[in-house]
Every structure is written in structure tokens, then in C-alpha cells.
Amino acid sequence: MNKKCQGCGIILQTEDPNKEGYTTNIENKVCTRCFRLKNYGEYKITQRTNIDYKKILSKITDEDLVIYVTSILNLETKYLQNFKNCILVVTKLDILPKSLKENKLKAKISLLKNYNNIKDIILVSSINNYNIDNLYNTIKKYRMKNNYFVGATNSGKSTLINKLINNYTDKNIIVTTSAYPSTTLDTINIELEGINIIDTPGLLNEGSVINKITEKQIKTINPKKEIKPRTYQIKKEGTLVIDDIARINYKTSEGSMIIYIANEVPIIRVGETNPRLKNYPPKKISIKKGEDLVIEDLCFIKFTQNTELNINIDKEIKIQTRKTII
């Protein structure tokens, strides 16, 4: 019987150090890649596509429950409608200002994600152990055959599963977590008091900023504590540059924007003639009052008025608007 890595789910092997699942001793619980990532922060790139993940997700039946995990920063739910029975779990609640009311957030998210297959929406913080009991009891309530945790890379899915393991079992299992894509490589089965939990690899979000920035930047954009929203008063033709990732040029009259982004990410004002990021062709975006602008896995921006923007950014990074959640 093949033995799986407890960290990423890949089958362990001792023959080829250049292939996935390599370990020096088959008795080890984790592969070398997971060991070095956890203990030394060394990340080894693994090429994956959503074709690989779709094969795994095709095993999910109508008798199963999908716990669809998404970060509060972007609320990605691309594959959510593929499943019959879902709980939508919004993670990283702790990174938003404490002044925000959970019930109002949940109500606005419910309007954005008004799908018939969603049984519940639960906002959680794995770091603060907030609403974890609520999630666990909700999973138990439905008593489905299997309980699949599904979500995009960097959604906080594996961190959430580790919190469940820590809270409700005495098993010495730690799913490998990191800010990098493709940390989990195959399914990981975990039994919690008779409930079958299945962690799946993080879905690759083709429009994510993570695919286009450096490893150092990936660490920086991942919020580690409560975000301090940054408000900018902007005049016509005013320009902001976000960490050599995005250049935002304000085309309309005076107004303000409030940026929700990791505190460590640098944002600077530049003049119109400054060439930074002008090598990217501008995307023209129209924003209505009461909408957010979302740059996938980087930030969301709230505007106080109707606005016309030019945004210089890699063409493959997804930008979208939505009704504001704040």
C-alpha cells in the first residue's frame, strides 16, 4: 500500500530526489519538500494545472458536502456552483478592522453569493479560533458521506483544517501550509470523531497576482495581522503605485479611495510622467459609488464616488468590481 505525505498528500517515494514525494526514509511522515518548507521556508516550485485538480474534484458526489473556503480579501468562488451541497466558509476575518460588524459582512456576502447550493455561510478566523466550533457543528449537523474542503491557493484552507485537527483530535498530523501556490498536492483524508474530512489541493486561480510576483512579494502581500485601511485623497490624473504590481491612475475629478491591503505592502504617489509600470498597457475601469475594485489576491479598494481609472498591471492578473462588502 502506498504511503502518503501527511503534509501535502503526495505518495512518498525514495527513488528519485527530483520527483514529487521524495523522502530519504519511507518511514518518514512527510516528504522532503514539506519538511524543508516547514522548517526552513524553502519553497520548491511544483507545476500544476486545474486539469489535475478537476480530476480530484470529479470524485465529489451529490452525497458529499463541500466546505468551500475563500479568503475575505477576494471572495473567490469560481467552482462553487459545480457542487450540490456547500458550506461557504470565509476565512481571515481577523485581518479586517475589528470595528466591522460580522452580521453586516455576512449579509453583504450573502447578496454577492446568492447560490441555491449554499446551505450556510460561516465567517471564521483560524488564528483567533473564531467560529471554528460553529463550523464543526455545522458539518456534523449535515452528516454527509464525505466532507471535502475545496478552495483556491492561499485561501487559508489547510490552516483551517489544522485548526480542526488541533481542536477535535489528538492526532499528530499537521497539513503543510504556506503563502505559496500548490502546497497541497493530493487529497489528505482525516477522521474527526467519525467524520471523514478530505483536504484537496488548492485550486489554481489563473487571474491571481500570486502567479506574477516574486516569492518575497508573495510573503509581503499575505496579511499577517489586522489591516489598517489606507485612505488616499486623489485629484484628477493622480497616480498611485502598489509595490511595482499595479499603477492606478485616477481619471475623474477629486475623490477618495480606501485600500484594504496587507500593511507591509508599499504604496506611493507618483507623477503622471513617472514611467513606473507604464510598460503594461492600461486597463480602463469604471467604478460606481458603492462598489469595490478587487485585484485578485492583492487587495480590494472602496471608492466614495463614481470613478474612471486606468490601471497598468500584468494583463493576466484579474481585476473585477463588485458591490462593496464594507
Regions found by a protein language model. Name each.
Residues 1-66, 73, 84-87, 93, ...:
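Helix-rich effector regions associated with P-loop NTPase G domains
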Residues 57-61, 78-84, 112-113, 138-142, ...:
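Alpha-helix C-terminal capping segments
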Residues 65-68, 148:
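Conserved beta-strand elements of the Class I
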Residues 68, 89, 122:
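Conserved Rossmann-like nucleotide-binding pocket used by diverse enzymes
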Residues 74-76, 156, 167, 204:
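Glycine-rich nucleotide phosphate-binding loop and flanking beta-alpha elements
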Residues 77-78, 130:
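Residues that form or flank phosphate/diphosphate-binding pockets in enzymes
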Residues 87-88, 148:
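Short hydrophobic alpha-helical runs that function as membrane-insertion/retention elements
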Residues 95-155, 161-174, 178:
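Canonical P-loop GTPase G-domain recognition
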